[in-house]
Each structure stands twice: as structure tokens, then as C-alpha cells.
Amino acid sequence: QEVVEANNRIRELEAEEKREIIQILKHITMLIRPNTKELLRAFSFLADLEFVRARVSFAKHIGGVCPNVAPYPIIDWTLAQHPLLKLSLEKQGKKVVPLEIKLDRKQHILIISGPNAGGKSVCLKTVGLIQYMLQCGLPVPVGENSKMGIFNKLAIDIGDEQSIEDDLSTYSSHLLNMKNMMKMADSSTLLLIDEFGGGTEPTIGGAMAEAILMRYTQKSAFAVITTHYQNLKHFADAHDGVVNGAMLYDRHQMQALFQLQIGNPGSSFAIEIARKIGIPEEVITDATNLVGKDYVNADKYLLDIVRDKRYWE
């Protein structure tokens, strides 16, 4: 009986406490009601202040700056770094290789080629993320002398978008994205496309990619595109407004340098990589004979040009 009475007393006290809290809150509400507008303005000001503080803290964390911003589309970046990759590598005691890239009205499409795992996709994602950060009003990890513009539209095609529900293959999904990009492309659009034309038979895939690339060029769209296709590299050399870029590779150490060099197409280093991982030499010889000496020699000459350019620079 005593336990029951004690429990009832506790419940009564808890209910009394809740009633008292409600009374206090009502009283406070009555006191502040005449100042509601001032309080809302103060709340908004504090939110803005916190946003500024968060931006400063974020900028310090990623090494971000407020670059020179132009009222027209332009990408003229030095020391650009992917912020997430930068933080991840710093934890491992490593450093990001900075990206230098320039696109303007005269040179508005960049075709990046080079070996797999050489940094092509990282370059693409770095451009996309930094540009989006800027347009969200955030500091960006680039050199202080970098110049950045504003794009009205950004479109991205990266990764495998195969859909079971929509019955779309990887290539079909890729083509659907290309179709939408052709519709939206204009001189204030930035397109980011990874492995352009991939996912299908190389001959028709490369031809389709070249035909679509011609439309982007005609519409003066800005674009950063990665590819292995030779015809797209030739397209860049033959058309104004389009430029090749190569991901550099150390042929002696057989490792990627993760540096983008604009002006020359890159090699896929297929023969060198196959030899490095131990593919039998007779298999490599057969592959070389099948593809033709001219193709292999052209790839070798391309490597020599890139090497010589690096030496003289």
C-alpha cells in the first residue's frame, strides 16, 4: 500500500511539474510577443552570421579562397584541388597533384585522354565540384589568381547509369544523357562527360561520340570530356574551339603522374601496362601485329612528343 501511495505521489508531482513548466512558457511567450518582429530579424541575422562563420571555417579546412569571379563563363584555374580527395590524402600523409586548366570562348572544349587510373575522371570531378561549390557561394580550393565564371547550366554524365526498372543499358542511358545535353547546350552551359562514347562497339561508339561532339562545338558549349577514342583526339586537332589534354605517365617508373597537360593528346599506354603486369611477351607481340605497326608507332611518337615537351618546359 505504501509503495502504491508513493508511486501515485510521484505521478502527481510530475504532472504538477509539467503544469508549472507550461505556465512559465506561457508567461515568457507573453513577455516576448510584443517583440516578435525584432526577434525574427535577430534570428535571421544570427543565421547569416553562422553561415559566414561556417564558410570561413570550411575555407580553412579545405584551403579554399574567394577567386576572381567574372560575369561570363570562363575557367582559368591554377592549383585546383578536389576538396574531398585533398582531405582524404592528407590523412594518409600524401598530397593532391593540383590541376591547371583554362577554357574560354576561343578554347571551350577539352578532350582529356590517357591511361586508365591516370586521373582523367578525377580531373573531371574536380572541375564539376569546384564549379558547383563556387555557384553555391562557397570558397573553393584553387590558386588566388584563378579566374572563374558563372554558368547558367551544368550537366554531368559520369559513371554507370544502367537502370533495370527503365530497361536502359549503360550505353542507352549514356545516349539519353547526350540527347538531353544537345538540347540544353549553349554558350553558357558546362558539360562534363566521362568515357565519351563508351559502353558499346568502339567503331560506332566513337563515330556517334564525334557526331555529338560536333553539335556541342557548333553550340559553343563549354565541356570537359574524357575518352580513349583516337577519332575524338583527331577531332580536337582539326576543329577550332576544341583542344586535347593528356594525363602524364612516367614510362620508366610505369606509374601515373596525375598531371594534366593541355595541348597534346594522351596515350593509353596499353602495351606498357600489359608488359608491366606480366602479360607474356609473345601475346603482346601478337597484339601489336594485329593492331598494326603504324598504330603502335604513332602511339610511341605521341609519347616522345609529350616527353620532349616536358623536358624543354
Region annotations inferred by a language model:
Residues 1-37, 95-97, 106:
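Switch/coupling subdomain of P-loop NTPase systems
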Residues 4, 57, 83-85:
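Residue-level signal for secondary-structure boundary sites
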Residues 10-13, 46, 313:
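Short amphipathic alpha-helical coiled-coil/interface segments
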Residues 14, 50-53, 79, 182:
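A structural signal for well-ordered alpha-helices, especially hydrophobic packing surfaces
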